[in-house]
Amino acid sequence: MTQQSGRIWVMGGRPLNGTAAIPAAKNSVLPLLAAALLCRGPVRLRAVPRLSDVECSLGLLRGAGCAAHWQGADIVVAGMPSNSTLPGETAAQMRASILFCAPLLARLGRAETSLPGGCNIGARPIDLHLEGLARMGAKELDAGAGKLVLAAPGGLHGTDFTLRFPLSLIHISEPTRLGMI
C-alpha cells in the first residue's frame, strides 16, 4: 500500500470480494429514524445501537403518533405521523431532534417542539437548518423562548440552496434532504 497526493493505492494480485458487517453508527441511524416519518409502510432498521439519542428518537416518533419499538437489536417504526407537536422534554435532550421537523412539515404542514438540546461541546446553532427549510417554504412562527414552531401551509418545495460554512456540522444537510422527499 502506498500513499500519493492524498490517495491511498492498494496493490495486490487478487481482486477484493466477500462481505463485511458494518456496525450501525448513531449519526447514520438518527436521520433514518426521522425519515421513517415519510414512509407509508413499516420501516425496520437492523442492528441499531442502543444509545440514549436512539431512545429519544423513538420517543419523538411515538410523540408524532407512530408506533416505534425494539425487536431484539432491530427497530420497527409503523404508522403515519398524526401529531405535529413533538414532546419538548424529549427533543431538548438531543441535538438531532431538528431532523424530525422536515418530515413533519412535509407530512402535516407543521412542526412544533422545543429547541434542540444535547451535549455541550460548544455553540451549535440551528440557523442553517432553519435557513434551508425556509428556502423550501417553511416559516418560523413566534413561539416564545425555548420553543420552535414551523409551518409550511403550501407544503415544502424543491429549491436551489448552497450551504454556507461550516459544512462540518453533523447532520447539516439532512433536514433539507428529508424535506425534499
Predicted stretch roles:
Residues 44-116:
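Glycine-rich, N-terminal phosphate-binding loop and its surrounding beta-alpha-beta segment
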Residues 84-162:
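Hydrophobic alpha-helical hairpins/lids featuring a short glycine-rich hinge
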